[in-house]
Amino acid sequence: MHCPFCFAVDTKVIDSRLVGEGSSVRRRRQCLVCNERFTTFEVAELVMPRVVKSNDVREPFNEDKLRSGMLKALEKRPVSADDVEMAVNHIKTHLRGTGEREVASKMIGNLVMEQLKKLDKVAYIRFASVYRSFEDIKEFGEEIARLQD
């Protein structure tokens, strides 16, 4: 690491500690040229795959879009914010775990439906009705029947 004072390349780590519930590392460093000390923080960079939409447009993964879609389905339902965050994190972990650089938006939609089914059946039906473009009451009934199985 370059020294921020003299820009020398040679520095040594004097002390390392975990901070932020173990999600990052704080390091005290000392320059071997000018002997100045400074602090650095290391955080793992977790790259999310790009999303390939049904029309083949590619866009960066948007966690806010994922969360807002789920929250819209869960509106006025008895589900805690913590449970929603756990579901969002589960989906993100699954997407990162694929190891793919790109994932289909359809996969994300299916993961959302899977999580909503666990959280709240009404929210699941709300989301499914939009996601699967239900055309009539019969399709609602069929989906509800599948839930009851």
Curated annotation (Swiss-Prot):
GO biological process: negative regulation of DNA-templated transcription
Necessary cofactors: Zn(2+)
Keyword ATP-binding: yes
Cofactor note: Binds 1 zinc ion.
Record-level Gene Ontology MF annotations: ATP binding; DNA binding; zinc ion binding
Zn finger (unnamed) start-end: 3-34
Domain ATP-cone: 49-139
Keyword Hydrolase found: no
Keywords: ATP-binding, DNA-binding, Metal-binding, Nucleotide-binding, Repressor, Transcription, Transcription regulation, Zinc, Zinc-finger
Record HAMAP family: NrdR
Role of this protein: Negatively regulates transcription of bacterial ribonucleotide reductase nrd genes and operons by binding to NrdR-boxes.
Similarity comment: family membership: Belongs to the NrdR family.
Name the record gives this protein: Transcriptional repressor NrdR
Organism listed in the record: Klebsiella pneumoniae subsp. pneumoniae (strain ATCC 700721 / MGH 78578)
